[in-house]
């Protein structure tokens, strides 16, 4: 048994743990009933561990928003210490623990979920499918990386070529995201996630904003948009006055449900010239916070930890199971 200390921290959750010879969850802000349910869930997992070298988890909770994040943290500890490959899979408002195509345990929210919702799976098996309302493979790749870590399968509009384009006629990020998610969900009968993301530059009064994708005109490309942005800021020499934020609004829509909305910002500055080969959109000209690094210099996993989209998806994952269960 290692002496390694594990830690996970974001704005909603903070866990510190280590492996011991017993199971213990303690701390602030966690209901006793939640702790008992998680302990009962994981006791079944612990029962399959090596009894000659017993391993248990000792986790202190500083802050906590949902069972999903806490269960994922503990399972990650168990996997690293025992070389197991247990997966945490959100499904129809529940949380499934699976390994090698076997279902090990199920966490149910308070009040349970309807059997019709739980067993309404596709021929591909358990696990929620998210249809991303975009044909942009770069954006889809980011979402696939993020959702894949949480057990979701991702499709995009390229899988549904018959669907019409949804005009983004809104004047806010939320209006546009709602238009896409709710329209496509109504047409397909599927759960749909749409994002409206953009770059807000303070010196330009928040532009390009909702017009980020077409900032340089009807035939806009990433290169043209970046060139126009740098031209607009050509006479702004002080980096502090070139402050900007990438913004994402995510909307999840499903038939007969109220839509779920989350938002996040990624602060930084606009560079004087592009740099980096990764990412897409305005990444080459966006300096990340005070780091001096351009977003296009980050590897995908680094960007997912920091970016507006990564932050928004993590917020979404925190509230998503309760949203599913409440409206199922």
From Swiss-Prot:
Needed co-factor(s): Mg(2+)
Organism: Streptococcus pyogenes serotype M1
Catalysed reactions, semicolon-separated: XTP + H2O = XMP + diphosphate + H(+); dITP + H2O = dIMP + diphosphate + H(+); ITP + H2O = IMP + diphosphate + H(+)
NCBIfam families: PRK02491.1, PRK14822.1, RdgB/HAM1 family non-canonical purine NTP pyrophosphatase
Name under which the protein is recorded: dITP/XTP pyrophosphatase
GO molecular function: dITP diphosphatase activity; ITP diphosphatase activity; metal ion binding; nucleotide binding; ribonucleoside triphosphate phosphatase activity; XTP diphosphatase activity
Gene3D superfamilies: 3.90.950.10
InterPro entries in UniProt: dITP/XTP_pyrophosphatase, ITPase-like_fam, RdgB/HAM1
Residue ranges, annotated region (NTP pyrophosphatase): 130-324
GO cellular component: cytosol
Region described as Unknown: spans on this chain: 1-129
Subunit structure: Homodimer.
Family from the record: Belongs to the HAM1 NTPase family.
GO BP: nucleotide metabolic process; purine nucleoside triphosphate catabolic process
Details of cofactor binding: Binds 1 Mg(2+) ion per subunit.
